[in-house]
Amino acid sequence: MTATLERRESASLWERFCSWITSTDNRLYIGWFGVLMIPTLLTATTVYIIAFIAAPPVDIDGIREPVAGSLLYGNNIITGAVIPSSASIGIHFYPIWEAASLDEWLYNGGPYQLIVDHFLLGVCGWIGREWEFSYRLGMRPWISVAFTAPVAAASAVFLVYPIGQGSFSDGMPLGISGTFNFMLVFQAEHNILMHPFHQLGVAGVFGGSLFSAMHGSLVTSSLIRETTENESANYGYKFGQEEETYNIVAAHGYFGRLIFQYASFNNSRALHFFLGLWPVVGIWFTALGIMTMAFNLNGFNFNQSVVDSQGRVINTWADILNRANLGMEVMHERNAHNFPLDLAAGESLPVALTAPAVNG
């Protein structure tokens, strides 16, 4: 009997690279979507840090009045921001090679587009990487589905809203006070507080926080003790164990008696599906609301909707909100030639019954 030994052909460099990229044994899973995610997020992060520290002022309104947003130009952590691209650029794609010089690119807010575009590509790559990793481990894809909610929200404020408004200068500035400024201006121009999709988003975020706190406290309070009184309860568990960690029957009974019977779940799958579904759907609706308001399908307007028998207006909270919106709009549009149309086109509202006497 003759035995023949053959040398095994070594895998090519490409095959070894593919095996390494898709290996679930790596300390951090990379995956093919990670090949897209890693360079784009690194680019966005690097440019953001540099721009936040040292970017020169940007002509955001396209009227030769640059606005400084970086730390080296007098801002602090709270007031600093990466200023959106100039209104003179509109929604045109504005990479570095489209500008006549680097100074012109910086003056027109080119870093904002570079950061936003790479960031959105990166977070989409993160979604794909979550799905890919789950697939290779034999898990179901709901982790990546849940992450579509924040990605939809980011896409709404950084991409869809500027496109709908006709300029990337209307996008959300990349900073703390810039975010609040964006929120105030958005309310002034679109009355988002009166939009049902935003209200669903508020219910999703605050409701999700409440349900998460309730669930965590109930689980922690109903752990099954596997140790003695002299040992920490944490020593009685190991990651991936088959046995239940907590007593869902006890938690269900406690909560059912605290409120009422049908307010609690006695099925762990249904409970956790609900905990994941509630905030995700709420944020989906908020993102959808931003996208509809991007094209000026705004919140409800109930201004001057209540009148008495003589036809005189009885002011409601909607009218107070409208007055606040007009005030925020005036503060936002600080140039006379940009005077808000909703103020310029309507009848003048008296703010004083008599003119003040001026002594001088």
UniProtKB/Swiss-Prot annotation:
Catalytic activity: 2 a plastoquinone + 4 hnu + 2 H2O = 2 a plastoquinol + O2
Cited Pfam families: Photo_RC
Residues forming coiled coils: none
Binding sites annotated in the UniProt record for chlorophyll a ChlzD1: H118
Sites marked Stabilizes free radical intermediate: H190
Database matches in CDD domains: Photosystem-II_D1
Transmembrane segments: 29-46, 118-133, 142-156, 197-218, 274-288
Binding site for a quinone: H215, S264, F265
Broad EC category: oxidoreductase
Main location: plastid
Positions annotated to bind [CaMn4O5] cluster: D170, E189, H332, E333, D342, A344
Alphabetically ordered keywords of this record: Calcium, Chlorophyll, Chloroplast, Chromophore, Electron transport, Herbicide resistance, Iron, Magnesium, Manganese, Membrane, Metal-binding, Oxidoreductase, Photosynthesis, Photosystem II, Plastid, Thylakoid, Transmembrane, Transmembrane helix, Transport
GO biological process, one term: response to herbicide
Propeptide cleavage-removed residue intervals: 345-360
Subcellular location: Plastid, Chloroplast thylakoid membrane
UniProt-annotated binding residues for Fe cation: H215, H272
Function, in words: Photosystem II (PSII) is a light-driven water:plastoquinone oxidoreductase that uses light energy to abstract electrons from H(2)O, generating O(2) and a proton gradient subsequently used for ATP formation. It consists of a core antenna complex that captures photons, and an electron transfer chain that converts photonic excitation into a charge separation. The D1/D2 (PsbA/PsbD) reaction center heterodimer binds P680, the primary electron donor of PSII as well as several subsequent electron acceptors.
Record HAMAP family: PSII_PsbA_D1
Extra facts: 2 of the reaction center chlorophylls (ChlD1 and ChlD2) are entirely coordinated by water. Herbicides such as atrazine, BNT, diuron or ioxynil bind in the Q(B) binding site and block subsequent electron transfer.
UniProt subunit comment: PSII is composed of 1 copy each of membrane proteins PsbA, PsbB, PsbC, PsbD, PsbE, PsbF, PsbH, PsbI, PsbJ, PsbK, PsbL, PsbM, PsbT, PsbX, PsbY, PsbZ, Psb30/Ycf12, at least 3 peripheral proteins of the oxygen-evolving complex and a large number of cofactors. It forms dimeric complexes.
Family, similarity comment: Belongs to the reaction center PufL/M/PsbA/D family.
The name this protein goes by in its record: Photosystem II protein D1
Lineage, uppermost ranks: Eukaryota, Cryptophyceae, Pyrenomonadales, Pyrenomonadaceae, Rhodomonas
Gene giving rise to this polypeptide: psbA
